[in-house]
Amino acid sequence: MISTEFIKNHLRKILSIRLRVKLGLALRHRAKGYAHLNGFGLEIGALHNPAQLKNSCTVEYADAINKSEAMHIFPEVNPKDLVDVQYIIDLDKTGLMALKNTHYDFVIMNHVIEHVANPIDVLAELFRVVKKVVML
């Protein structure tokens, strides 16, 4: 089992990156990719900085912790900014087993895959839950 301290440290690193994104200091190329997305999707690891998508997109959220845990771990983040997580997942242990095959039109993971033990397994799970792959 992953310790709370590990999750805290891991998420603090992600938080630092996301704050830079929010302030416009990080990569801006994501918007070009997001412009191609439509339909029903899944975003993994959004925390308080979900992808800015078109109105034609509907998104469910998955993360290692729920909103109330995130509020406790990150008191510096405005709770209103935290996404409501529909799926609590551990990509290293169970992958996306809780999700149906070919259920989503797209999946977004920003700054997540580099933190998993076996990225190839995670990619296989992503291919399983999307209807068709158009872009990585």
Predicted regions and their residues:
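Membrane-proximal basic amphipathic "stem/tether" segments
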Residues: M1-A35
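Class I SAM-dependent methyltransferase SAM/SAH-binding core
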Residues: A35-L96
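Alpha-helix C-terminal capping/helix-to-coil transition sites in glycosyltransferase folds
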Residues: H36, T102-H103
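Short conserved AdoMet
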Residues: K54, A117, K131
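Hydrophobic beta-strand segment of the Class I
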Residues: Y104-I108
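A short His-aromatic
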Residues: H111-H115
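A short glycine-rich, Lys/Arg-flanked "PGG" loop and its adjoining helix->strand segment in the class I
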Residues: I120-V134
